[in-house]
């Protein structure tokens, strides 16, 4: 059985560049940044303070995914916080529980910071998140694209 673990990226971590590359692969149309710009954004995010965290997952020591806990999300966003954002698992590591582990670790980071709820937007993974205890709060539109606003009660 594979060994999977998550950890918080620290300022100056060499993995930041890899996470930035993954973020551009998955969300480049939304991020609208060059690789160097996204590396800088992620470095600033990691150094940004207590309310935000960048997590990485490793599978048998190999980088396999990332996820963010962030106080804000897509603009204009709903006036709630914090957000689970930027979940990405490397294609060859999908369907091994890495996404679930990253979500759980992100939820725990939110809980440790005293939050009772956490939120996310998704366009195509509603059933996946519902299976993890999340619920749809609202169907909305973002840039003419349907999205679901979802929440998870961290007290449960």
Regions found by a protein language model. Name each.
Residues 45-50:
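Short loop/turn motifs at secondary-structure junctions and domain boundaries
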Residues 54-56, 62-72, 83, 88:
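Conserved beta-strand in the GNAT
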């Amino acid at each position: 059985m594979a060994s999977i673990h998550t950890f918080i990226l620290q300022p100056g971590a060499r993995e930041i560049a890899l996470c930035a590359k993954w973020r551009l692969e998955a969300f480049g149309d939304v991020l609208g940044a060059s690789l160097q710009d996204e590396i800088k954004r992620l470095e600033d995010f990691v150094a940004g303070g207590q309310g935000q965290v960048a997590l990485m997952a490793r599978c048998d020591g190999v980088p396999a995914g990332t996820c963010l806990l962030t106080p804000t999300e897509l603009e204009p966003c709903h006036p709630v916080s914090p957000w689970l954002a930027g979940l990405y698992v490397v294609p060859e590591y999908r369907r091994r529980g890495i996404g679930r582990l990253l979500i759980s670790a992100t939820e725990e980071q939110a809980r440790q910071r005293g939050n009772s709820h956490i939120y996310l937007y998704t366009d195509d993974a509603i059933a996946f998140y519902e299976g993890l205890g999340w619920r749809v709060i609202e169907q909305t539109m973002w840039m003419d694209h349907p999205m679901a606003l979802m929440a998870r009660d961290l007290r449960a």
